């Protein structure tokens, strides 16, 4: 790394450890010091953090980045009709150039709303990786594998996953890593799931999979295999500490115990689950059992944005109303889900503002009417702030956004490129 050193002077600092004030020194791609004794002469670049809040970069643990191109094409539908009648037919027309355009757009949206790392499952992932490399973000990518019991399709899906591993794992100074992405237990054959588990074990790779998103999925898997999705995935060896299980809405208590015992990382996607009326994930119970629960936006077609601030607020309020308990999932807990828990889920040495941690940092402008009076940073961050309050973003020690201005990518060009791609894909 040859990044210049950066000093952020005088912000309030909020992370999973609490709130404090201090200056933050970044050298290369890591936080070198956090203290009140640092001076401007200690760094090449100085950012004035007065009147601002510094937090760890947000981590989106489940999304489909290039689906920004499908934003708004199939709203107000249940998941099965949404997929079968609209999304899958549109996805059949995708190519690498379209996915690159959608990924660039998604990267800009995430930078502007404070996300520095994400977990992405989709198609043409080498093109997605190229977009992420140009944007300067950090991610785990996986080719979404679906075989529907077709042996030839299974072989092709595994071949593509191996290609992406070979070409993309460790790209961009290791900011881009590759996982295996079997779509779900109802779209993947037992053989594909077992091959995935074996390949993950052999290469020490993460697995990214949708689990128990809807009642229909649970019923379908139970009819086909005589087991719930969690039980079935455990049987075929998919569940483990490197597995990120997205959604996990329809869970029995004993299934939560299995997830906890296997140290599975759960990605909660409240906005998508609400929009598709999939149900409410038992997040409070998962956390009580010691499961690492993080947050994801899902794709922009089922959210319909990638704003993790929205996701934090929605997650907290959804648990409160569902449990009829105003104390459920308080602000600091959900903030930790969006930062430290997400970093742990993806195996990223970040999520805290502390010496030695990766320099993935977001600075918020707190001098806004909706953040005034500024008296409770955790509350304001979760319940009042939005992605529009993001002032500066640093990922891997590199400034991507400063004073609201992008320092990577050409925003106007990317929006025009994505608009044209979406028009060609969806008419």
From Swiss-Prot:
GO terms for MF: 5'-deoxyadenosine deaminase activity; 5'-methylthioadenosine deaminase activity; adenosine deaminase activity; metal ion binding; S-adenosylhomocysteine deaminase activity
The residues the record assigns to binding substrate are 91, 183, 213, 298
Stretch forming the signal peptide: none
Q: What class of enzyme is it?
A: hydrolase
BP terms from Gene Ontology: S-adenosylmethionine biosynthetic process
Q: Which reaction does this enzyme catalyse, per its entry?
A: 5'-deoxyadenosine + H2O + H(+) = 5'-deoxyinosine + NH4(+); S-adenosyl-L-homocysteine + H2O + H(+) = S-inosyl-L-homocysteine + NH4(+); S-methyl-5'-thioadenosine + H2O + H(+) = S-methyl-5'-thioinosine + NH4(+); adenosine + H2O + H(+) = inosine + NH4(+)
How many and how are cofactors bound here?
Binds 1 zinc ion per subunit.
- UniProt keyword annotation of Endoplasmic reticulum present: no
One Pfam family it belongs to? Amidohydro_1
Q: Which InterPro entries match?
A: Amidohydro-rel, Deaminase_MtaD/DadD, Metal-dep_hydrolase_composite, Metal_Hydrolase, MTA/SAH_deaminase
* Cofactor(s) required, per the database record: Zn(2+)
Functional summary from the UniProt entry: Catalyzes the deamination of three SAM-derived enzymatic products, namely 5'-deoxyadenosine, S-adenosyl-L-homocysteine, and 5'-methylthioadenosine, to produce the inosine analogs. Can also deaminate adenosine. The preferred substrate for this enzyme is 5'-deoxyadenosine, but all these substrates are efficiently deaminated. Likely functions in a S-adenosyl-L-methionine (SAM) recycling pathway from S-adenosyl-L-homocysteine (SAH) produced from SAM-dependent methylation reactions.
Q: How does it assemble?
A: Homotetramer.
Provide the family line. Answer: Belongs to the metallo-dependent hydrolases superfamily. MTA/SAH deaminase family.
Alphabetical list of PANTHER family matching this protein: AMIDOHYDROLASE-RELATED DOMAIN-CONTAINING PROTEIN (PTHR43794:SF11), AMINOHYDROLASE SSNA-RELATED (PTHR43794)
Its recorded name reads 5'-deoxyadenosine deaminase
Q: Which gene encodes it?
A: dadD
């Amino acid at each position: 790394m040859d990044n210049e050193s950066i000093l952020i002077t005088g912000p309030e600092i909020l992370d999973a450890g609490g709130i404090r004030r201090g200056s933050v020194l970044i050298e290369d791609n890591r936080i070198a010091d956090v203290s009140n004794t640092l001076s401007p002469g200690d760094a090449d670049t100085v950012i004035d953090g007065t009147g601002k809040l510094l937090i760890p970069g947000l981590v989106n643990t489940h999304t489909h980045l290039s689906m920004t191109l499908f934003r708004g094409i199939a709203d107000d539908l249940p998941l099965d009709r949404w997929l079968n009648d609209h999304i899958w037919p549109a996805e059949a027309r995708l190519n690498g150039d379209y996915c690159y355009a959608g990924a660039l757009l998604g990267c800009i949206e995430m930078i502007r709303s404070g996300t520095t790392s994400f977990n992405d499952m989709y198609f043409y992932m080498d093109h997605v990786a190229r977009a992420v490399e140009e944007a300067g973000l950090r991610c785990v990518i996986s080719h979404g594998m679906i075989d529907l019991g077709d042996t030839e399709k299974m072989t092709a899906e595994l071949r593509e996953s191996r290609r992406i591993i070979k070409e993309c794992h460790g790209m961009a100074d290791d900011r881009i890593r590759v996982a295996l992405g079997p779509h779900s237990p109802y779209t993947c054959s037992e053989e594909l799931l077992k091959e995935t588990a074996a390949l993950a074990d052999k290469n020490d790779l993460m697995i990214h999979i949708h689990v128990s998103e809807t009642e229909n999925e649970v019923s379908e898997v139970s009819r086909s295999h005589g087991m719930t999705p969690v039980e079935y995935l455990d049987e075929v060896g998919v569940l483990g500490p490197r597995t990120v299980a997205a959604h996990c809405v329809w869970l029995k208590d004993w299934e939560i115990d299995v997830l906890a015992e296997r140290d599975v990382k759960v990605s909660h996607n409240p906005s998508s689950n609400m929009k598709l009326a999939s149900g409410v994930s038992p997040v409070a119970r998962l956390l009580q059992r010691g499961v690492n629960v993080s947050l994801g936006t899902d794709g922009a077609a089922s959210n319909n944005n990638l704003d993790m601030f929205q996701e934090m607020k929605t997650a907290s309020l959804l648990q409160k109303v569902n449990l009829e308990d105003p104390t459920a999932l308080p602000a600091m807990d959900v903030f930790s889900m969006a930062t430290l828990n997400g970093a742990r889920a993806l195996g990223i040495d970040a999520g805290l503002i502390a010496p030695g941690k990766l320099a993935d940092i977001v600075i918020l402008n707190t001098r806004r009417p909706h953040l005034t009076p500024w008296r409770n940073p955790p509350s304001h961050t979760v319940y009042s702030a939005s992605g529009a309050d993001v002032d500066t973003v640093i990922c891997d020690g590199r400034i991507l956004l400063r004073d609201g201005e992008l320092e990577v990518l050409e925003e106007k060009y990317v929006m025009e490129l994505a608009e044209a791609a979406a028009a060609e894909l969806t008419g």
